[in-house]
UniProtKB/Swiss-Prot annotation:
Catalytic activity: Cleavage of 4-deoxy-alpha-L-erythro-hex-4-enopyranuronoside oligosaccharides into 4-deoxy-alpha-L-erythro-hex-4-enopyranuronate monosaccharides
Protein family according to the UniProt entry: Belongs to the polysaccharide lyase 17 family.
UniProt GO molecular function: exo-oligoalginate lyase activity; metal ion binding
Positions with a binding annotation for Zn(2+): 415, 433, 464
Protein name: Exo-oligoalginate lyase
Chain's gene name: alg17C
A Gene Ontology biological process term: polysaccharide catabolic process
Thermal dependence: Optimum temperature is 40 degrees Celsius.
EC number of this enzyme: 4.2.2.26
Required cofactor(s): Zn(2+)
Extent of the signal sequence: 1-23
Impact after mutating residue 260 to A: 2000-fold decrease in catalytic efficiency
């Protein structure tokens, strides 16, 4: 059994695995994919002994029995995602898989008959299908609007067929295989070469579908092209996807939402490979990359939900079916009892042999707390294309988590938000990211597609908590250019007193460079950690700099006086996302630090900030999302934007402090006022010092040299004193 340390240690030398040039499908009996003959025997003998497993199985059985009562319904394809025919075919493929499983475990032939009848109906219909009548613009399908859904149908349905194949007559097998499985495998592979060979989650689903079909049908050719690409050279296919789509830390370049989605084909196909060709040692490939990917997917969450960076729907979390199945497989391999903590939080069990092991271990009380770590997740196949930094302090669901997005673009699903950040605290998202503009499978909202506002708003830089120059998005909104560049990670540090991530972006705009350092600081006299943010920007030409902060909560007050637009609200701008923001208030600010305070649930948050710049034209803008949205596609959001005009240089410095407690039931409030008295910033010879003065007379001194030499001594004159430190950064708390 692989040790947990082996899996998590990203510095371990890669395990060299030789992959045979030609696949040799084993002669295993059926089922032989995700569930094996031995699994069936184990489940049948003991599933009622484990409450979690029995509850899940009985629930699935009840649901399937109700579905079966409706009869075999296989409509001709008509609707796009979210429409009736689309959803019915989705229900059908899940029913085929579940019926096959229940037939194996219970021996009740009604499940075999139902799965068989569904598959025979598809075998009769599929050969007559052309392109879907509501086909998607790219990679259209036949049964579904896009070929991606076709691949998902095959991944599920072939598992159901695997479970019933030994109970079918020869002519029934021939009809099903020649009518639907082989034609669909052909359509997804040789007839869709661009998608099949693509290093992308759509390609992963396609190769998994075709490869799993090959294992069940005993077709070496289907397995080999799935593993090595259509030309069998290894330049495409599953093995190349394992090489390219995950970083050495297990981070998927499109971000957590699509990492979650891609887990299913990766893990299920790998399980099928392990079952049929264990000599490949697929779960050890590339230094256990698939196991790391599952751990990383968990780490990319807070309070049960994934970080909504890039194209992401914010209601997706660790209870998603993809992670339920993946966790069971990884637990079976590692025996890591901290994964049981996640399994219990998921609230459901994978109905597989691996899921039985999870249920058994939970029932035996083996659960240990999962360790949500502060980690740096390198991006790109070699881990050298930027990184995602996750800093955590505290325990449980209410701990604080700071996310610094210093990653590569993330291909077509990426957003133009270099050096963006998010903050979580007290179980909530405090500094927020919009995610994607989409109502998945809600046909009334543009057929469930990504909305136009995904491009006009959600992907634009102004929709994020990062620097905007001259109201233009990063890379001027061009994804091809954006894919060529990534931030430079300058430093990552995780200590007891403070944590730090720092990165530089020099390509987002012509003639502009900006560096951002985010710190999570423990201050003994404060109840909660504080966030310190230092963003320096320099430009060749005088420019307008905007730095948004999207915050979640009800505004309490500002230290600055705002000018309200009483009679009319106007758009903040005309394009690049600005056209979707209503300008509510404006306020001129100067060189002294200012503050905004809001409340969320029972906790207050104060954002103290100061901007160092030669420009005398500084303003704070308060805006709301919703302009130019006639179809009400956009959620409400509020934003504080710090604007500097006609400047070549600016340093945006801020401190975010959680404080106090409000109890509406008891009608009590404590600590409603910020503990931060002022924020001061000094820059000298490319070094920064930030002094956070607290009301109790103490202060926090943050020093940044941007020099990685840990022995190099640095000095900055801050007022009447000289601040000295060694290395890239220093944080000192000085008591009164």
């Amino acid at each position: 059994m692989l040790s947990v340390n082996t899996i998590k240690n990203t510095l371990l030398a890669a395990v060299l695995v030789s992959v045979p040039a030609t696949a040799q499908v084993s002669g295993n009996g059926h089922p032989n994919l995700i569930v094996t003959e031995q699994d069936v025997a184990n489940i049948a003998a003991s599933w009622e002994s484990y409450d979690a497993y029995a509850e899940q199985l009985n629930a699935d059985k009840t649901n399937l029995d109700a579905f079966m009562a409706e009869g075999v319904v296989v409509p001709m394809p008509k609707d796009a995602g979210g429409g009736y025919t689309h959803e019915q075919h989705k229900r059908n493929y899940k029913a085929i898989r579940n019926a096959g499983f229940l037939y194996q475990v219970t021996g009740d032939e009604k499940y075999l008959t139902f799965a068989k009848d569904l598959l025979l109906a598809y075998a009769k219909m599929y050969p007559s299908l052309g392109e879907h009548p509501n086909r998607k613009e790219q990679s259209p399908g036949r049964l579904f609007w896009q070929s991606l859904n076709e691949a998902v149908w095959l991944v599920y349905s072939i598992q159901g067929y695997d479970a019933i194949i030994d109970g079918l007559a020869a002519e029934e097998k021939q009809e099903i295989e020649s009518g639907v499985f082989l034609p669909m495998a052909k359509f997804l592979s040789v007839e869709s070469p661009e998608t099949f060979n693509k290093i992308h989650n759509h390609g992963t689903w396609a190769v998994a579908a075709v490869g799993m079909t090959g294992y069940v049908l005993g077709n070496d050719e289907l397995v080999e092209i799935s593993l090595m690409g259509l030309d069998k050279t290894g330049k495409a296919g599953f093995m190349k996807q394992l090489d390219k789509l995950f970083s050495p830390d297990g981070y998927y370049t499109e971000g957590p939402y699509y990492q979650r989605y891609a887990l299913m084909p990766f893990i299920w196909f790998a399980k099928a490979i392990e079952t049929n060709e264990p000599e490949r040692k697929i779960f050890e490939y590339r230094n256990n990359i698939l196991l790391k990917a599952v751990y990383t997917t968990i780490d990319l969450s807070y309070a049960g939900y994934f970080f909504p960076i890039n194209d992401a729907l914010k209601d997706k979390g660790i209870d998603t079916v993809e992670l339920v199945h993946a966790l069971a497989i990884v637990y079976s391999i590692t025996g890591d009892n901290t994964l049981l903590d996640i399994a219990q939080e998921q609230g459901r069990i994978s109905l597989t042999g691996d899921g039985l092991k999870v249920a058994k271990a939970v029932g035996e009380g083996l659960t240990q707390p999962y360790n949500y770590r502060s980690i740096l997740l390198g991006d790109g196949a070699d881990g050298d294309q930027g990184a995602l930094s996750i800093h955590r302090l505290g325990e449980g669901h209410n701990h604080m988590a700071l996310v610094a997005k210093n990653t590569s673009q993330g291909m077509g699903h990426g957003h133009f938000d270099k050096l963006n950040w998010l903050l979580y605290d007290n179980g909530n998202e405090i500094v927020t990211d919009y995610g994607a503009a989409r109502y998945l499978n809600v046909e009334a909202k543009y057929g469930g597609h990504y909305l136009a506002e995904n491009n006009t708003w959600a992907k634009q830089t102004i929709a994020h908590n990062t620097l905007v120059v001259n109201e233009q998005s990063h890379f001027y909104g061009d994804v091809t250019t954006a894919d060529l560049h990534h931030p430079e990670v300058l430093s990552f540090y995780s200590g007891e007193d403070y944590q730090l991530s720092s990165a530089k972006e020099a390509n987002a705009y012509d003639g502009v460079e900006f560096v951002r350092s985010m710190l999570l600081v423990n201050v003994p006299s404060l109840e909660h950690p504080i966030v310190v943010d230092v963003l320096n920007v320099s430009a060749d030409k005088a420019s307008t700099f905007d730095l948004p902060l999207y915050f979640n909560g009800q505004i309490i007050d500002f230290s600055f006086k705002v000018k309200d637009n009483k009679n009319v609200m106007k758009m903040l701008g005309k394009r690049n996302g600005y056209q979707h923001l209503w300008l509510r208030n404006t306020a001129p600010v100067g060189d002294a630090s200012e503050r905004a305070t809001w409340i969320l649930d029972d906790r207050f948050y104060s954002y103290a900030f100061v901007t160092s710049t030669p420009s005398k034209k500084q303003n704070v803008l308060i805006a709301e999302l919703g302009a130019n949205d006639p179809n009400y596609n956009l959620r409400q959001q509020q934003v504080l934007i710090r604007r500097v005009e006609k400047a070549k240089q600016a340093s945006f410095v801020s401190v975010l402090e959680p404080h106090g407690k409000y109890d509406g039931s008891l009608e009590t409030t404590s600590g409603a006022y910020s503990n931060v008295k002022s924020v001061k910033h000094v820059s000298e010879n490319g070094k920064d010092v930030v002094v956070v003065d607290l009301k109790d007379g103490s202060n926090v001194v943050v020093a940044l040299s941007y020099n990685a030499n840990s022995e190099q001594v640095h000095k900055v004159n801050a007022g009447e004193e000289a601040i000295e430190w060694k290395g890239f950064s220093s944080v000192v708390v000085r008591r009164k």
